Design a protein with these regions (language model features):
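Short, small-residue-biased leader/transition segments that mark boundaries at the very start
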Residues: 2-4
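Aromatic- and acidic-residue-enriched carbohydrate-binding clefts of CAZyme catalytic domains
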Residues: 6-46, 86-128, 162-168
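Conserved, well-ordered alpha-helix/loop/beta-strand core segments that scaffold catalytic motifs
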Residues: 45, 49-78
Length: 168
């Protein structure tokens, strides 16, 4: 998201929960004012993203013409400090102030006798269900535009869904 990228730069690369309140909470009045103020910089970033996307399409088409499959990696969880979480807080187990309600991990198993704490917000599945999993569908759709084969990393996060208190 170009807007979150520009805000991150403006606020010295701080995570979104350390931004001023009006931006942390995505106050539309302040965001619209910001977008108007920074319209040229935002347009430049959008053009750069478009150009990179076009270059990727050339690479993908070249690979396809030589019967080469491109493999991508889609993480099950997204970073707490991602544009996805900042833009869609209601879909994640996160308080408006950025603190985690629940965080991800896996219980003890043969890889780790103590389990693993991944530190990423878990999902509010009921909210995803209400949107017919729109966020997920768009996420997969975009990845399949970029690659031919997609590895879902870590499927264990779905098959053995586990969450712990966010303050753990």
């Amino acid at each position: 998201d170009v807007c979150s990228s520009d805000l991150r730069e403006e606020f010295n690369m701080l995570p979104w929960w350390e931004w001023p309140q009006e931006f942390k909470l995505k106050n539309n009045k302040f965001l619209n004012s910001w977008i108007n103020k920074k319209s040229e910089e935002i347009l430049i970033k959008k053009l750069i993203q478009w150009h990179l996307d076009e270059q990727w399409c050339v690479i993908k088409n070249f690979a396809k013409s030589r019967n080469i499959k491109l493999i991508g990696d889609l993480p099950f969880y997204v970073s707490r400090d991602s544009a996805d979480v900042w833009s869609n807080k209601s879909l994640f187990s996160i308080f408006k102030n950025g603190n985690l309600i629940f965080q991800s991990g896996v219980p003890p198993d043969y890889f780790s006798s103590t389990g693993q704490l991944w530190g990423t917000p878990t999902y509010f599945w009921s909210k995803h269900k209400r949107t017919n999993f729109y966020w997920w569908r768009k996420r997969f759709q975009r990845q399949f535009e970029l690659v031919d084969i997609l590895r879902f990393d870590h499927f264990r996060g779905l098959a053995g869904y586990w969450r712990v208190n966010g303050s753990s």
